[in-house]
Amino acid sequence: MKKILFTFISSVLLFSNSVFSMTLWTTETQPGRMQIQEELIARFTAKTGIEVKLVPQEEDELIEKASAAFAANSLPDVIFNAACVNFCAWAYDEGVFDSDAATEIVNSLGIDTYSAKGVLSMSEVEPGVYASVPSGAWPNATYYRMSYYNDNGLATPTNYANILAGAKALHNPPNRYGAIVPTDVAAGFMSQWMETFAIANGLHPVKEDGSINFDQKKTIEMLETYKALVGMSPEGIHHWQNGRDFYASDVVPLTFWASYLLDDIAGTRDNVPIMVDDNPQSLALAQDTNVIVGMAGPSNPDGGTWVEVHNFGVTVDANTDEAAAFIEYVMNEEYVTWLGMAPEGSFPIRPGPSAGSNIFIDEWGNLPIGVDRKIPINQIYSAEIIESLINGLAVGTRWGAKEGQLPVAAKLVNSGLMNRLMMEYINGDRSAEE
C-alpha cells in the first residue's frame, strides 16, 4: 500500500503542469558527498519531476542559519543533519520542525522496519510523535585485539570488570600499555566518552523536570573505573588522535573510539600506518580486532552506549508533500546510496524496506570504506562483527533523550564540567564523593 501511495503521489507530481521545487539543506558538505547527493537528486527529479535545490550548511552554523531563516519565513523544505541529536531537539523546541509531517513519514516507512528502536525513540518527542525522521546512526565502541585476549585467556571486554581485568593483565609499560582513554578536558572527544561510560553504568543525571542529579553510587563506580584506565594509559594528555595512533602502532591492545575508526585501522590511510607487521597498509590489525557496541557497568548489566543520529527534518515552511516524497525516496530506493557517503559513520537503522528484510544491511556491508584506499566493509570485518555493530545500536542513547531534556543535557556536556571534575579526581584534587 505504501509503495502504491508513493507511486501515485510521484505520478501526480510528475505529470502536473506546475513546476515543483524544494530546497534541501545538508551538512554533508564534502565535495565527494555533495556529488553523491547531486546525482541522487537528479535521479529523484527524473522520476518525480520535483526539482531539488541542494544547499550545503556547516554543522556548527546550522542553528544560527535556521534561526535566521525561521524569523524570515524562509526555511528550506528539508534539513538533513548528520549530527542531529541536539540540533533536532532544538529545532523541535523552537518550532522549526513540523512533527506532524515527520510522524507521517515515520509511520509510512513503518515503525516495524526500524531495528534500532532506541535510536528511533530519540526522535520521539511525545508517545507516537516524532520531531524528525532518523536515517542512520554511528556509535561509540570498544576496540580490542582478539589475539592478545584469547592468548591470555581474557574475557571479552563488554563490561567494567572485564575491561579493567584485561587492561591490567596486558599492561606492561613501556612496551605495551593496558588501554587508552581520552584525558583532554577541552576536547569534545573526552566529553563523549565520559557520557559513554556514564550511560554504560545507567548514570543519567538529567531528570524529566530538567534538574541535574548525579546518583552517587553509579557516579563513583564510573569515576573509579575511568581513573583506573587512565592509570594504565600511556603518559600524557590524550585525545582522539592518540586513541587511534597508539592502537594502530601496537602500543595499546584496547581503545575506545567512534565507529569512524573502522577504516583507519584497516590500512586505508597513509597518515595512519599499521605497525603490527611489516606492511603499513596491512589488514592484519583490523582482522585481529573485535568491535563491541555497548558497555555495561555494575549498576546497569544491560549496558548502553553513546550514539549520534542522522535525521531528516521537515520544516514548518515546507511543501510537505514534496518533502515526504523526497525523504521516502531516499529511505527506500536510495537508502544505501545515502549511507554510502560515509558508511563507517552511517549505520543502517532500517534493515530493509519491510519487516523481516535485511537487504539494507547486506548492501551496507558491500560499501567501500577508507580514505587513500577503499575496501568493502565485509572484506575487512566478519559477518558476526558487522551484525554486532548493527545490533549494538539497540542500546544507543544520550543523556536527556529518554527524559525529553536533550537541550539541558547538551548544556551540561558542552560545559566540560564532567571532564574537569574527572581530572581533578584523577589528580587527587577532589574525592569521588565530592
Predicted regions and their residues:
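Extracytoplasmic "Venus flytrap"
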Residues: M22-E38, Q405-A410
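Glycine-centered hinge/linker elements that transmit conformational signals in sensory
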Residues: A167-A169, E208-I237, P280-M295
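Hinge/lid segment of periplasmic solute-binding proteins
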Residues: A83-P139, L164, M190, D278-M295, ...
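Extracytoplasmic "Venus flytrap"/periplasmic binding protein-like
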Residues: E39, R43-S115, S147, D151-T158, ...
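C-terminal lobe and pocket-closing loops
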Residues: I265-A266, L283, P298-L417
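Bacterial N-terminal signal peptides
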Residues: T7-S16
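Extracytoplasmic/periplasmic solute-binding protein
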Residues: E126-S135, L164-S211, V252
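Short, well-ordered beta-strand elements
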Residues: F20-Q30, I50-V55, V78, A131, ...
